[in-house]
């Protein structure tokens, strides 16, 4: 029998931590605490309000982090239901593909047809040859297995099975497409993947790309009218959950030290107060645990292999106002890292609104573009596109998309971490265990509670 009275420490109040707490409550666990070092919950779901409109007297949310969802966001839908948020009535998405000079990019008919043909081919291969590829998380993939939540089912049914072809998912996505003779389909995935900071296809294992943008989801991104947005911002989803929890997150509280004993865990907060727990669930970057936790040799070995993306967003006002979001495919290459890839124009028909720019600064094996250089380049790119910046409202430099290399993925990194779940009274959640978007993160956190509590 599970001990539902045990005291559980949840580190982090982002989508993972909120989902863990919500599902613990649903299973009858009432003795938990969430610690969040920021003054808000939601993590990279951050939706500050800014003034806009003809008289600059309308206050509306902008999105500095997570922007959108789609019809298979079932874990997010559970969070909406629990916390009272809704994507109904969110601002409609729209976009244009542009040259770096600000002219609309037109693809030839033959190029479009070839792209769609290869997309159809890849979709069929994913359904048959790579059955199980879209199962949440990475448990067993390096061994040719799948084991986790099936994201195409509203109940997020947990499935398990074997498929030796899944080992291919460890290779970089560009190699995966080439091996399957589907290179022409790459732009379909590049728009929602690279432009939003998740890296370049020659460096990122195919598993990350395809578990986030499975065959159904990537087609939803092709038809922007089907995408979800939130009038009150993605942050409102997790604020809603937090408000409805029996024990909302304790804000402005950083976990600064962890000591794991044989029968308890001592958690030090803000460098002074110490609390005692039976278990901890880490819902923040695992590699940061090495700085404050009493890491085992295995934790040190595995978590030191995690890499992340250097990615920042800026809310800027331009003259003139654009009327839609712009995507710059020419800047979505390793050689153009540090350039503007996309900006998000959130509110159709509303003038004087800031747009949010998205810029990626690093690539595996290459020198990082310094932050200040990338900032200047991004502003220059807007001017080049005919939208000079008149004011910068805010900048958020994110610790983004923790993941492992193709080599470490193929070497079974995930199975080694999964084998540590529950040892030393410790459980590992957070985005690295699935993917760096709110749905994959929430799905994994949900399933972790089902599996272990």
Model regions: which residues?
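N-terminal Rossmann-like FAD-binding beta1-loop-alpha1 element of flavoenzymes
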Residues: 6-33
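Glycine-rich FAD pyrophosphate-binding loop
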Residues: 25-51
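Mobile amphipathic helical/loop "lid" adjacent to a hydrophobic cofactor/ligand pocket
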Residues: 76, 80-82, 86-203
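Conserved FAD-binding subdomain of flavin-dependent enzymes
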Residues: 40, 44-47, 53-90
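Conserved Rossmann-like nucleotide-cofactor binding loop
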Residues: 16, 40, 287
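Mid-domain catalytic core of redox enzymes
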Residues: 27, 256-369
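Helical element adjacent to the flavin cofactor pocket in flavoenzyme catalytic cores
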Residues: 212-264
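Conserved flavin/dinucleotide-binding core of flavoenzymes
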Residues: 345-453
């Amino acid at each position: 029998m599970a001990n539902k009275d045990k005291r559980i420490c949840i580190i982090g109040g982002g989508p993972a931590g909120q989902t863990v707490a919500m599902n613990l409550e649903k299973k009858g666990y009432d003795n938990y605490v969430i610690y969040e070092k920021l003054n808000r919950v939601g993590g990279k779901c951050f939706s500050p309000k800014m003034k806009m409109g003809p008289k600059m007297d309308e206050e509306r949310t902008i999105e500095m982090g997570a922007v959108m969802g789609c019809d298979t966001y079932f874990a997010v839908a559970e969070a909406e239901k629990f916390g009272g948020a809704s994507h109904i009535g969110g601002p409609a998405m729209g976009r244009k593909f542009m040259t770096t000079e600000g002219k609309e990019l037109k693809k030839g008919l033959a190029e479009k047809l070839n792209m769609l043909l290869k997309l159809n081919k890849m979709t069929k291969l994913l359904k048959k040859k790579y059955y199980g590829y879209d199962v949440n998380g990475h448990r067993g993939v390096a061994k040719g297995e799948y084991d986790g939540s099936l994201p195409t089912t509203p109940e997020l049914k947990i499935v398990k099975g074997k498929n030796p072809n899944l080992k291919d998912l460890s290779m970089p996505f560009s190699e995966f497409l080439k091996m399957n003779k589907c290179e022409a389909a790459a732009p379909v995935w590049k728009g929602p993947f690279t432009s939003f900071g998740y890296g370049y296809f020659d460096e990122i294992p195919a598993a990350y790309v395809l578990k986030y943008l499975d065959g159904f989801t990537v087609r939803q991104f092709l038809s922007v009218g089907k995408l979800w947005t939130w009038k009150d911002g993605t942050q409102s989803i997790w604020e809603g959950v937090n408000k409805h929890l029996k024990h909302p997150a304790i804000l402005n509280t950083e976990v600064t030290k962890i000591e794991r004993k044989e029968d308890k865990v001592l958690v030090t907060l803000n460098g002074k107060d110490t609390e005692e727990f039976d278990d901890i669930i880490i819902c923040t970057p695992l590699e940061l645990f090495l700085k404050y936790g009493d890491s085992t040799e295995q934790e040190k070995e595995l978590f030191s292999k995690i890499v992340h993306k250097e990615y920042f967003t800026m809310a800027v006002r331009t003259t003139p106002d654009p009327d839609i979001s712009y995507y710059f495919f020419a800047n979505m290459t390793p050689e153009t890292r540090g350039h503007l890839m996309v900006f998000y124009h959130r509110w159709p028909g509303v003038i004087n609104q800031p747009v949010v720019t998205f810029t990626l600064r690093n690539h595996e094996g290459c020198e990082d573009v310094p932050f200040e250089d990338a900032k200047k380049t991004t502003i220059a790119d807007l001017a080049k596109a005919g939208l000079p910046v008149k004011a910068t409202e805010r900048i958020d430099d994110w610790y983004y998309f923790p993941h492992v290399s193709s080599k470490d993925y193929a070497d079974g990194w995930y199975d080694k971490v999964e084998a540590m779940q529950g040892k030393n009274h410790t459980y590992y959640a957070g985005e690295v265990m699935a993917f760096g978007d709110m749905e994959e993160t929430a799905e994994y956190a949900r399933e972790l509670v089902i599996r272990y509590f």
